[in-house]
Amino acid sequence: VEYSNAGKPVVFLEQDVDYPMGKREDRWWAAYASGGTVYLPLVMVDSGHQISSGSKADFKAAYRTLVDAELTRPPQAQIEAYARQVGTKMRVYARVINAAGQPLSTARNDATLYALIWEDARVGVTGRIVRAAPWTGISPEVASGGEFTATLETANLTSVNWNALHAVVFADYRPGTGSAYDMLQGALAKPAALTADPDSVTVALDANTLEDRGVSVRLVGPYVLSWTAVADVPWVSVTPDSGPISVQPTIEVRSGMLSPGWQHGAVTFTASSEDGLSVAQTIAVSAFSGPRVV
């Protein structure tokens, strides 16, 4: 149930076919789209691009064929996902950029965003059991290149090991006139946090220069965050000094306020959301002022 292909880890997530969660089992049947009897296990890669059922002489070889075919396909979306525990629930923040080359919406092509929450626990056969599968329709319509954001939340999760819980977020849609669905892309959810790139700034300025030095910073985190920046030394400023996570700041070193030699400071970015998420990230700033060396 696990192997690596071209450096890409592959895992299979399991859920009870008699107690399905979310829409995953529905997607299998939509891809099957024929009569007759099927036998367990029902296996699906993507949202139905490749399916299998029943016993196999060599399960690993059969499923490897399904997965290898999927790994050759280019993604049709970009997804950023973050997750955190809120009481006995898991909350997932997702941001999707539509790269499918066509509009996406529930009304147009049943486009849907999901989270699968699984626990590393041997309940069935794989050692990875799905505990929740919240989803939401993509609405209003998202044009090609457009963005969709959503927060998904599970019901109360009891009798689980929170240290063994993980979340994957993906989007799918029905691409044609048939019944089968196609997955646009998936992404593992990261812990809900704020990160900054670069995580430190060092500049050296000619003592006679009158120009300030600016360094662009990329802040990354859940789409719900808004941030504020505070510098702990007067020779550092941040422009802008606050904004939503989509707004990227610049750290400015004020040359006219530097003393000769090295000096050190820091900028702390504090971010929060209306639903109670609060995170922070500090960037160390070092500056040298002195004669130019040639």
Q: Where is each model-derived feature located?
A:
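Beta-strand-rich extracellular modules
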Residues: 170-174, 254-256, 270-274
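Beta-sheet-dominated interaction scaffolds and their linkers
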Residues: 191-220, 255-260, 289-294
